[in-house]
Amino acid sequence: MLDIISLGWGSLLAIFSFSIALVVWGRNGF
């Protein structure tokens, strides 16, 4: 149960940080 929750949070943080990176790169024009 804890493994599933931690895995869910890990993937959520990964997608969140990845989306932020895309926004930053988009504003900087790559």
From Swiss-Prot:
Keywords: Chloroplast, Electron transport, Membrane, Photosynthesis, Plastid, Thylakoid, Transmembrane, Transmembrane helix, Transport. The keyword Transport applies. It is a single-pass membrane protein. The chain crosses the membrane at residues 4-24. It is found in: Plastid, Chloroplast thylakoid membrane. Signal peptide: none annotated. GO terms for biological process: cytochrome complex assembly; photosynthesis. InterPro entries: Cytochr_b6-f_cplx_su8_sf, Cytochrome_b6-f_cplx_su8. One of its GO terms (molecular function) is electron transporter, transferring electrons within cytochrome b6/f complex of photosystem II activity. Pfam families: PetN. One of its GO terms (cellular component) is cytochrome b6f complex. Belongs to the PetN family. Component of the cytochrome b6-f complex, which mediates electron transfer between photosystem II (PSII) and photosystem I (PSI), cyclic electron flow around PSI, and state transitions. The 4 large subunits of the cytochrome b6-f complex are cytochrome b6, subunit IV (17 kDa polypeptide, PetD), cytochrome f and the Rieske protein, while the 4 small subunits are PetG, PetL, PetM and PetN. The complex functions as a dimer. This is Cytochrome b6-f complex subunit 8. It comes from Gracilaria tenuistipitata var. liui (Red alga).
